[in-house]
């Protein structure tokens, strides 16, 4: 059996489901029953994808067009609330993406004999006159969708300067979303292979916590510093006595790791999109083994792109005497745990042409389990 003090994720997901059911039943004056997943408005869903420069799902685009057909003012309101919204116009959200969305929407509206507002054409014209830089921004919104939760610069190209660490990837977005369920009592977080810093910085913004972001490439470390500043997080050189919303950047080479420099305790270790290079997995698991001496658990998120890399990762975890306490998947806005599915829509949307779930691992030393 497991130690009752073992850190677990699955009960948090299940309890969130129960909370939604209980809240809905209270609203309906019922004591029992089921509840459908809380659904955002079509416009807010569209706004989330647009601000994060994530491809608009086909069904969502159809829903938007349908709304425009039903309501003659919907297209104008959409333009005001999304395309010309200050959140959008004040950030360098990928211009090519915005142009493509507007062109597709205008084409669909015209095909359905919907009057396209002048403001939509004007915005398209403005975007076509803008030049993309080497870096673009992704913007993620609060639960209400009216404010910016976190924003990140990333390289225009997924492979830039010889590294993939300058781009945002799926598992980092899904890991950030998972932490909406994790209590803020875990206020010291260490992230391995931070890349753009989506997971760690978003966690620092959502919770009252201090996050240490680590990577090795100099260009990636510089981008992390930029994204910390972009999100108004305190660095370790500033006074953090008022609150713990703080993020710092440190260089950490998995292949040349000096544990004596990392003896400060952390509550949780996190990592996303780090299980892709099998040549580095033994070193990664060694680092996890050492760091877990002073941490409750490590949460690793990865996409199922290559089954052999997943198997290799699990093999090296076993060799490092680390236990997979929990393993589950997230896809299409739902966690799959055994035969059960728990809907929990993401506020960190991400689109990939490769449709694959994100796998979550809760990793702990074997001696933390009592049999």
Curated annotation (Swiss-Prot):
Organism: Caenorhabditis elegans
Gene Ontology CC entries for this record: protein-containing complex
Matching CDD domains: AdoMet_MTases (cd02440)
Protein name, entry field: Uncharacterized protein R08D7.4
Gene Ontology MF terms: protein-lysine N-methyltransferase activity
Biological classification of the source: Eukaryota, Metazoa, Ecdysozoa, Nematoda, Chromadorea
Record PANTHER family: HEPATOCELLULAR CARCINOMA-ASSOCIATED ANTIGEN, PROTEIN-LYSINE N-METHYLTRANSFERASE EEF2KMT
Database matches in InterPro entries: Methyltransf_16, SAM-dependent_MTases_sf
């Amino acid at each position: 059996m497991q130690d009752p003090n073992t850190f677990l994720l699955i009960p948090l997901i299940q309890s969130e489901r129960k909370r939604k059911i209980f809240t809905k039943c209270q609203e309906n004056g019922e004591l029992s029953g089921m509840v459908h997943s809380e659904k955002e408005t079509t416009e807010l869903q569209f706004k989330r994808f647009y601000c994060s420069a994530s491809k608009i799902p086909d069904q969502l685009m159809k829903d938007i067009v349908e709304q425009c057909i039903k309501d003659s003012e919907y297209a104008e309101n959409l333009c005001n609330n999304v395309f010309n919204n200050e959140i959008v116009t004040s950030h360098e959200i990928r211009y090519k993406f915005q142009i493509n969305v507007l062109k597709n929407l205008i084409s669909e509206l015209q095909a359905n004999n919907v009057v396209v507002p002048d403001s939509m054409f004007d915005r398209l014209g403005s975007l076509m006159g803008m030049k993309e830089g080497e870096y673009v921004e992704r913007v993620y919104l609060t639960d209400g969708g009216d404010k910016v939760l976190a924003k990140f610069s990333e390289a225009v190209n997924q492979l830039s300067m010889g590294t993939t660490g300058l781009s945002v990837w799926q598992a980092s977005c899904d890991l950030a979303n998972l932490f909406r369920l994790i209590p803020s009592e875990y206020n010291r977080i260490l992230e391995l292979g931070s890349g753009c810093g989506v997971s760690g910085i978003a966690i620092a913004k959502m919770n009252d916590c201090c996050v240490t972001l680590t990577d090795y490439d100099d260009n990636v470390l510089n981008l992390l510093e930029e994204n910390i500043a972009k999100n108004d997080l305190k660095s370790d050189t500033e006074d953090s006595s008022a609150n713990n919303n703080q993020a710092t950047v440190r260089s950490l080479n998995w292949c040349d790791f000096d544990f004596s420099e990392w003896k400060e305790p952390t509550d949780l270790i996190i990592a996303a999109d780090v299980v892709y290079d099998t040549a580095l997995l033994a070193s990664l698991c060694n680092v996890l083994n050492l760091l877990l001496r002073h941490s409750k658990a490590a949460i690793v998120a990865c996409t199922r792109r290559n089954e052999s890399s997943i198997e290799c990762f699990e093999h090296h975890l076993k060799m490092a005497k680390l236990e997979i306490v929990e393993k589950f998947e997230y896809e299409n806005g739902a966690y799959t745990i055994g035969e059960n599915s728990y809907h929990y829509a993401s506020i960190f949307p991400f689109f990939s042409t490769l449709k694959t779930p994100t796998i979550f691992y809760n990793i702990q030393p074997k001696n933390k389990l009592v049999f």
